[in-house]
Amino acid sequence: MISSFIDHEDFFHHFQPIYDLKEGYIVGYEVLLRSKKFANPELAFNSAIKEKKLYELDSRSIHKALKTYHSAGFTRKEGILFVNVFPSTLLNPKFPSFITIIMKEKLLTNQDIVFEISEKETNYDLNHLKKVLKQLKKVGISYAIDDYGIS
């Protein structure tokens, strides 16, 4: 079921505004995956994990979200795009070429996106992740820890 869900991109995204409450303006948008097949997006990701398709779902979701954002005419002046990503996606050997493709498609500039690293996944090589994050930072892509401190 999850393979078909991914292959047909049977999901869409909401872009939740993130406000600077002190200054009263939108600083960016958090990308939220939604679907009619999964009432809760966590169920889709859990299914992808179970079927070893997490990278496929994560990368397809990121790509579709960026295409949607870009085709809607949003630019840097509307704010930064905050995109949730699993550590295993960042560590996947296909991820660097995925980023290159996105950059070539001009779906983002390196300052347009912040990868929010999910804490829901805990079984990964932290040293390897640090190296990947350094590489992202070298090309100007920012990152943050998603839901830091929530257990």
What do these predicted regions represent?
Residues 44, 48-58:
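Short, solvent-exposed cationic patches
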Residues 12, 28-30, 78-82, 112-116, ...:
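Structural preference for beta-strand elements that scaffold enzyme active sites
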Residues 41, 50, 145-151:
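Catalytic-site-adjacent helices and loops of nucleotide signaling machinery
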Residues 36-39, 62, 66, 147:
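Short acidic-capped amphipathic helix/loop micro-motif used as an active-site/signal-coupling element
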